[in-house]
């Protein structure tokens, strides 16, 4: 017996790896499933690409109002393959939004939101909201004219709400006006808070799909 087999047997004895693998590979797939049922998986793939490329850019990006734009320029012009990483990040973000929208339409048109899959639908809708939030927060991080005015408009929307509007605006911006605190908050949301929440809801979403299976045809 080779050392590799000994190591495998050691883990197998404690974790029952083969049983887990058999459970994953032997899951029943209904005959009506087609390529359109892969849209959710493609959305997940885009998210993983976002995580990888976004993590790579954190080594160079500086969330400081006076340096953010220059750091993005450095990524695009001077950093090795920086232009490629940022371009992949941008295009995979657009692809993720598109695949998510198509996935929602597919689920709705095939009745995948009906009993007993209501909670799966709810978590999916929440993931859609989180995806849109990624777009809003990430759009402003270059801190160019487009990003600055976008963040100013977005954070100013709650101001129309009576009584709580002004405090909500200040909470989003971190101060009375758009500035360093705003950029810091949006950077934290985009790189830590939103990814963490998204991963939690994705796990819930996938576990429910795993438990309930794929919905049948109409």
Curated annotation (Swiss-Prot):
The keyword Heme applies. The chain crosses the membrane at residues 35-55, 93-113, 119-139, 189-209. It comes from the Eukaryota. Binds 2 heme b groups non-covalently with two histidine residues as axial ligands. Gene3D superfamilies: Cytochrome Bc1 Complex, Chain C (1.20.810.10). GO terms for molecular function: electron transporter, transferring electrons within cytochrome b6/f complex of photosystem II activity; metal ion binding; oxidoreductase activity. Heme b 2 binds at residues 89, 190. PROSITE patterns: CYTB_NTER. GO terms for cellular component: plastid thylakoid membrane. InterPro entries: Cyt_b/b6_N, Cyt_B6_PetB, Cytb/b6-like_sf, Cytochrome_b_N_euk/bac, Di-haem_cyt_TM. It holds the Pfam family Cytochrome_B. It is a multi-pass membrane protein. Keywords: Electron transport, Heme, Iron, Membrane, Metal-binding, Photosynthesis, Plastid, Thylakoid, Transmembrane, Transmembrane helix, Transport. One of its GO terms (biological process) is photosynthesis. It is found in: Plastid thylakoid membrane. Heme 1 (or BH or b566) is high-potential and absorbs at about 566 nm, and heme 2 (or BL or b562) is low-potential and absorbs at about 562 nm. The 4 large subunits of the cytochrome b6-f complex are cytochrome b6, subunit IV (17 kDa polypeptide, PetD), cytochrome f and the Rieske protein, while the 4 small subunits are PetG, PetL, PetM and PetN. The complex functions as a dimer. Component of the cytochrome b6-f complex, which mediates electron transfer between photosystem II (PSII) and photosystem I (PSI), cyclic electron flow around PSI, and state transitions. This is Cytochrome b6. It comes from Cuscuta gronovii. The lineage of its organism: Eukaryota, Viridiplantae, Streptophyta, Embryophyta, Tracheophyta.
């Amino acid at each position: 017996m080779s050392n590799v087999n000994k190591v495998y047997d050691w883990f197998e004895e404690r974790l029952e790896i083969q049983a887990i693998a058999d459970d994953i590979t032997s899951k029943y797939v209904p005959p009506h499933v087609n390529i359109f049922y892969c849209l959710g998986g493609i959305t997940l793939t885009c998210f993983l690409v976002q995580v990888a490329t976004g993590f790579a850019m954190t080594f160079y990006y500086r969330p400081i109002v006076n340096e953010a734009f220059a750091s993005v320029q450095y990524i695009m012009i001077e950093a090795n393959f920086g232009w490629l990483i940022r371009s992949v990040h941008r295009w995979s973000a657009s692809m993720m939004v598109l695949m998510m929208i198509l996935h929602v339409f597919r689920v709705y048109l095939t009745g995948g939101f009906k009993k007993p899959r209501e909670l799966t639908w709810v978590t999916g809708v929440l993931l859609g909201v989180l995806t849109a939030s990624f777009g809003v927060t990430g759009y402003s991080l270059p801190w160019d004219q487009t990003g600055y005015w976008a963040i100013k408009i977005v954070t100013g929307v709650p101001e129309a709400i009576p009584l709580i509007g002004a405090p909500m605006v200040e909470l989003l911006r971190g101060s009375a006006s758009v500035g360093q605190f705003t950029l810091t908050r949006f950077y934290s949301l985009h790189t830590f808070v939103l990814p963490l929440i998204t991963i939690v809801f994705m796990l819930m979403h996938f576990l429910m799909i795993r438990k309930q299976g794929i919905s049948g045809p109409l």
